[in-house]
Amino acid sequence: VIKKILFLLFAAFLVSRTIELLQLSSSIRPEKLSWGASLAFAFMLNLFVTGIFAFPGFVFPTGQLLPHAYYRVRHPQILNTVYQVLAVHYFRKALLLGFWGKAKNRKRFFNGTKAGIQQFNYQTRQSEFGHAAALVLIFALSFVVWAQGHLLAFAFIHLINFIGNFYPVVLQRKHRAAIQRLLPADSSRALPNQN
């Protein structure tokens, strides 16, 4: 219970920091925001907004907020093309070199057992929801920054959002396309109880 409360407080803190960041940018004239400051601003906005969805997703089944049909991969060939064209496999390799390279961290997603496939399915949904929600909100907030005249920050926001949130969505959908081949159609609805 304490962990859930703390993580919700972290998310609320990030909401307030996001609002403060946007208020700060509105008080700065576009020509005063340097290249480096624009990049830092874009990075912080992406980090804060992604965290708003990540922290609750660590302690609540946020993936269930979207309907089951959303998570079904209906056109795996198109997904494979997007995966290849965007070179998402390099993004995956970068993740494996970092945090997910440790066996302990990988086992959180999939432990190699048959029951682990259901857990993996659940984790892909959790991850995809967090990144997809952040992707959409950051996209919307970027137009506030654009309206303030911070065009360089606007461009950096989209670049970071694309790599930091769109790539993970594609990666999780790629994982789920493989899961769908392993699980009967209805079994992917029976997700582990995560509280």
Please annotate each region the language model reported.
Residues 120-131:
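Short, amphipathic, aromatic/basic-enriched membrane-interface segments that mark the entry/exit
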Residues 62-120, 178-181, 185-195:
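Membrane-proximal soluble regions of multi-pass membrane proteins
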Residues 130-179:
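Hydrophobic transmembrane alpha-helices
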Residues 1-8, 120-122:
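Juxtamembrane interface helix immediately N-terminal to a transmembrane segment
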Residues 4-75, 130-132, 139-143, 148:
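Long, highly hydrophobic alpha-helical transmembrane signal-anchor segments
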